[in-house]
Structure formats: C-alpha cells, structure tokens
A protein has these predicted regions:
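Active-site gating loops and adjacent loop-to-helix segments of metal-dependent hydrolytic enzymes
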Residues: 71-72, 76-80, 84-100, 148-169, ...
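Metal-associated gating/positioning segment near the N- to mid-region
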Residues: 42-47, 52-115
Length: 390
C-alpha cells in the first residue's frame, strides 16, 4: 500500500490538501490532511509513505494520440521515427496512451502496433490503440475494423483516418460513413468508445466531409472525433461548430512559429472556452512519436520535427501563465479524454478510481508519477525504466 500525505488535490476539481491511500492499483481512501487512516499494524509496516508537502496532485494525463511504434516515413525509410520508450511518457506525467498508425500503415501495421501496446502495458503504462491508419480501406488484424473492435480488447476505435490532406487516400463520404458505422456498432456491442478518430490536414475542405456525413446519416455526431483542429485558424472555427453539434474535437500540442496560420494548443483552448462551446467536448493530445511535417507546394517533405509527450505539461504551464486556473485547464487532459474513450476509472482522483497520479513541482513539471499505484518517477528521478532503457 502507498499512503500519500499533504497533497493539494485537483481531481480535476480543487479539493484542497488531502491524504490518500492507494492499494491494488486503486484509490482506496481520500480524506482531509488532518485525518490519518487508522491502519492495522501489519498494513502500516508494509505501507510506503510519500509526503508531498502541499504539492499539487492531479490525475495522470491521458494522451489520446500517440505514435507508440514511431511515425514518419514521408521522405523514405530513413525518416521512420523510432518507437517511444516508457520514460518518454512517465517523466512527462502521461500515465495513459492511445496508440495509432499514421502515414505509414504498410511498413508498420496493426500487429506491430498491438504488440507495442502490450509491451508498454507489461512495463506498467496504461495503453490502448485504434485499429486502421491513414488510409481507406483500413489495415486490420482480423479482416475488418468491425471485428477488430469486437474481438480485440486493446482496440477502442478506428483511426487515425486522414482527410483534407494530400497524404490521405481521398475517402468519399460513403466510405467515411461505413467506417463510422462500424465504429459505432462495435462500440454498442462491446461498451467501448467506438469513435472514428480523424486526422485533419491543411486542405481547404476542412471538416466538410464530417459535416456532410453527420447531415446525411443517422450516426451520432459523437462518433466523429477530428484531431489537429488547431493547425489552421479557419479549421479551428469550424471545429467550434462541430463541438456544438456533438463531436469531441482534439487539439494537438505542437510548436507554432510566429506568424503561422495556426494556434498553439494553449491559445486554442483559451479561445474554445471563451466561445462558450461545450467544455466537455475538447481534448488535447501530443502526437508524440509522430512526424510534425512541413511540405512544399509539390507535396515533398521540406522539414520535420518529432512530437513529444512533454508538450502536454508545457501547454498546462502556458495556460496557467495566461491566467487560467489549473481546475479549469485540467479536464481536456484528463477527464474529457477519459469520457470520450469510455475509460471510466481514469481521468479523476476519487475513491475507486485507478491510482494514476502526478504530483507537480513549483514549475509545473512532473515531480512524482504513479501508475496504478506503482511509483514510476519520484522527485523527478525515474525509478522504473522500460526494458531497454538505461
């Protein structure tokens, strides 16, 4: 068991200074700091105590868009990004990842993706994934996305299917609807999220295909989950309307250059809240391990950076520096993705919830990281490393 004392808890709601008891991967007890649980002597002897001395304690971050196998490959095999190692996430306060395939869903496929998800789980990280990739028809493990979702526990939805992008397979509205229908029905059958996670490129068509799919079908708007919606300012304005219509939209925490026609995740989140759009229908992800690419007018790769899970905590710091409270800023990184993905025991600090916790230092960095009750980072030092980390 693990007793955490004197934690300034944001659940995401601010609860004040509390003590917590963790055991069996769960939060067993949560009480005021002045209260100490009267444990039997045998349990006291086996319990570890961490005194946070008033440090802020938040739910572990849920990163809903991660290239766990590595992304890239748009300029030859040498540009394929290596797989992401465990501490790349834990040191950044990320306790849950959702893996996916991007442009390269040929050299990399669902078998490798699923194996990487299982490997991360064995190393202590919470991990799930989407089936499919950028292209239509999608790559699958069982022969169809529908049966992938029904029979493979780790698959939560379909994605990331590319639209409004020169790298996409230029799917039609009917093709998009068939995928959305498969995701929706599989979600009904299994209780999974059953969402269609859609990569948005820089194309001027923007969210037109999603709007048409919603208007022309009976499929609920919540099934359609577009990401990268802050990459163009006009696209972001479209995303506000889509959120009002019932979709959850996802911001990407990527770097934005001065004068670029884009919003940082912090800027976009501030604008989103100011717009009055539903606060529960916005999430932020990192695109960790993905290729943050720039292309020339001929569609050739001009430059690339690699997405980092550290962008999530950096965005949280920027939001607070801009005057937003931690209580308001946290849900898009915690409870909102948990709700979208139907991970009912995650994204919150409450009795019975999974013990996925991050203590922040004064600078907003991850001081202590706990996943299902196991300490991975303590005093900013990695204490649990991945299999091939030194």
């Amino acid at each position: 068991m693990l007793l955490i004392r004197n934690a300034d808890v944001f659940a995401p709601r601010a609860l004040g200074v509390r003590n917590l008891l963790l055991g069996g991967g769960k939060i067993l007890w949560l009480g005021p700091a002045r209260e100490l649980l009267d444990l039997p002597a045998a349990l006291r002897a086996d319990s570890q105590i961490i005194d946070l001395d008033g440090a802020r304690l938040i739910p572990g971050l849920i990163d809903g868009h991660v290239h766990v196998t590595g992304g890239g490959g748009e300029a030859g095999f040498a540009t394929r990004i290596p797989p992401q190692l465990l501490s790349r996430f834990t040191t950044c306060g990320v306790t849950t990842v959702i893996g996916l395939l991007g442009t390269d869903d040929v050299a990399r496929g669902p078998r490798e993706l699923l194996a990487t998800v299982y490997a991360l789980r064995e190393q202590g990280l919470n991990a799930w994934s989407y089936t499919g990739g950028y292209h239509v028809p999608p790559v699958t493990l069982t022969g169809s996305v529908h049966s992938d979702l029904v029979f493979i526990e780790a698959f939560l939805g379909i994605g990331e299917v590319a639209i409004s992008d020169h790298r996409s397979s230029q799917p039609t509205c009917d093709e998009l609807l068939r995928l959305a229908g498969a995701a929706h029905v599989a979600g009904l059958m299994t209780g999974k999220a059953g969402v269609l996670h859609l990569h948005l490129g820089d194309g001027q068509r923007g969210l037109e295909l999603i709007r048409r799919a919603i208007a022309d079908s009976e499929i609920p708007a919540r099934v359609f989950n577009p990401t990268h919606v802050n990459r163009r300012r006009a696209l972001f304005e479209e995303a506000l309307e889509l959120a009002r219509a019932g979709s959850t939209v996802d911001l990407t925490a990527f770097p934005v250059k001065r004068g670029e026609d884009a919003y940082t995740a912090a800027e976009a989140l501030q604008r989103y809240f100011a717009s009055g759009a539903p606060a529960e229908r916005i999430t932020v992800s990192s695109d960790a391990g993905g290729c943050l690419a720039c292309f020339d007018s001929d569609g050739h790769l001009a430059s690339m950076e690699v997405g980092s899970a550290g962008a999530l905590l950096q965005t949280l710091r920027e939001l607070q520096a801009g005057g937003m409270s931690l209580e308001q800023a946290l849900p898009p990184f915690t409870s909102n993705p948990a709700r979208l993905l139907r991970l009912s025991d995650k994204g919150m600090i409450a009795v019975g919830a999974d013990a996925d916790l991050v203590a922040l230092d004064a600078d907003g960095a991850a001081q202590t990281v706990i996943i299902r009750g196991e300490v991975h980072v303590r005093d900013r030092t990695v204490v649990r490393r991945g299999t091939f980390e030194t």
